[in-house]
């Protein structure tokens, strides 16, 4: 599978939806990347922690990347938006 197919983009939906999507990818024995921007970053961290502590206890963090993206706002100004990518390795 490609890297984009193993990515879960966290947004406004309930946290457990993202936990289940991530769990399905990890159960195939593949790595999964949880991505989020802005206010959804805390939800992405929640997804990973719920997964590690309640469902797939052997899941490991493989990599965590933090970045800032510049987006053009409605008024034409550039806004800085934080983003996170958390790579999870399946349990052994």
PLM segments and residue spans:
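Short glycine-rich, basic-tinged beta-strand/loop micro-motifs
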Residues: 26-42
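Histone-fold modules and their flanking histone-like tails across chromatin and transcription assemblies
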Residues: 1-26
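Structured beta-strand/turn binding interfaces of compact recognition modules in eukaryotic regulators
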Residues: 13, 37, 89
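Short amphipathic alpha-helical interaction elements and helix-loop-helix interfaces
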Residues: 28, 32, 53-57, 92
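Conserved helicase motor "Helicase C" RecA-like lobe of SF1/SF2 P-loop NTPases
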Residues: 39-56
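Beta-strand cores of modular interaction/reader domains in eukaryotic scaffold and signaling proteins
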Residues: 9, 33-35, 85-87
């Amino acid at each position: 599978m490609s890297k984009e197919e193993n990515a879960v983009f966290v947004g406004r939906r309930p946290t457990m939806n993202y936990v289940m999507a991530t769990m399905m990818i990890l159960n195939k024995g593949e790595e999964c990347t949880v991505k989020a921007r802005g206010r959804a970053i805390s939800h992405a961290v929640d997804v990973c922690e719920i997964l590690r502590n309640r469902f797939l206890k052997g899941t490991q963090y493989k990599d965590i990347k933090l970045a800032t993206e510049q987006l053009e706002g409605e008024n034409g100004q550039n806004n800085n938006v934080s983003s996170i990518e958390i790579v999870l390795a399946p349990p052994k």
